[in-house]
Regions:
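Amphipathic alpha-helical and helix-coil boundary elements used as assembly
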Residues: 1-318
Length: 318
């Protein structure tokens, strides 16, 4: 069943966390209250509970994804895609969950998603560019206050960590078209970084395309996915209104180059609710958020982690 939690924001409005109850357990409890644990998941998670073998013909990947959603009874999604996508003559879901199927298609095409939460539903937003994201009301700029300054009434960050990791600087793909055996299909995409060891190349075959322009897009998607891992900033604080998919600008940090606009690609929250039983002790209500961010100017793409299904031998149509 659906369930939502609400959190009061500084403005007096409320932020909602909505999901499907995927698991519920009851413990022994303490005092006069029972103990329950509830796991909420987005409706997309239910696609991990169904599998199929299907063929889609003459459709673009966004249309295939939306058809899979609708066929399973889901309509709470939004198309915020801005790029053009090729038409697939033939696309097969083969002995895999519907979640794995749509995930690997999105990974190949450079599509990702995030969720917008409302009181009675959550909406999956298909995205592929900066224009799909907004700053939530009242959070266009969020200040950094050092922990030594003590408690601040305004939502703020109090901890900052930045990590950079060397990544491959270029990717070359190649493939073969049996209908055009002489066609040159090798493509290359690169993103230069101003540091040592930034130009190591990757090569992969087959690239899963028969037109070089499609290969160029796939190579770009993959190198952007890799380079999105190059620099990550983790910000911890009391910031109640920001979540994955949101934009904000950091202000007040001692390193001025870090006072820039970020895209949130992951969020964790810790909420402690005050206890209702007299004499039970414990702290009052507390909230802490930890946001995983990238520079808003860096394109975000999903890493290709979903395995391709394997067809073992020829398949008869009889």
């Amino acid at each position: 069943k659906p369930m939502s939690l609400s959190l009061e924001l500084p403005s007096g409005s409320r932020r909602f966390f909505h999901g499907i109850v995927a698991r519920c357990s009851q413990g022994a409890g303490a005092g006069q209250f029972a103990s329950y644990q509830v796991t909420l998941r987005p409706w997309l998670w239910l696609l991990t509970r169904t599998s199929d073998c299907r063929i889609f013909q003459n459709q673009k990947v966004p249309d295939i994804i939306k058809q899979v959603f609708r066929d399973l009874g889901f309509s709470d999604f939004e198309d915020a895609l801005s790029r053009s996508y090729r038409e697939w003559e033939y696309c097969v879901q083969y002995r895999e969950t519907s979640f794995d199927f749509v995930s690997r298609l999105m990974e190949q095409e450079g599509i990702y998603y995030w969720f917008r939460h409302e009181q009675k539903r959550h909406i999956l937003v298909l995205s592929d560019a900066y224009g799909a994201h907004r700053s939530p009301g009242g959070y266009a700029s969020v200040p950094y206050y050092p922990p030594t300054l003590g408690h601040r009434e305004r939502d703020h960050f109090f901890d900052w960590q930045m990590a950079r990791e060397v990544q491959p600087g270029s990717l070359t793909l190649n493939d073969y078209d049996f209908q055009r055996p002489g066609a040159r299909l090798e493509v290359r995409s690169n993103i230069a970084r101003p540091h040592a060891a930034a130009d190591y190349p990757l090569y992969d075959y087959p690239g899963e395309y028969v037109q070089s322009q499609d290969g160029e897009q796939y190579a770009r998607n993959r190198i952007e996915a890799i380079q999105a891992q190059h620099e990550r900033v983790r910000l911890r604080g009391v910031v109640r209104g920001i979540g994955a998919g949101h934009l904000f600008r950091l202000s007040g940090y001692p390193r001025d180059d870090q006072n820039r606009e970020y895209l949130v690609v992951g969020a964790e929250y810790r909420v402690v609710q005050e206890l209702y039983e007299t004499g039970s002790g414990g702290a009052g209500s507390q909230f802490e958020s930890e946001l995983d961010c990238i520079d808003a100017g860096q394109a975000y793409r999903p890493l290709p982690t979903t395995p391709l299904p394997i067809v073992r031998g020829p398949q008869t149509a009889v």
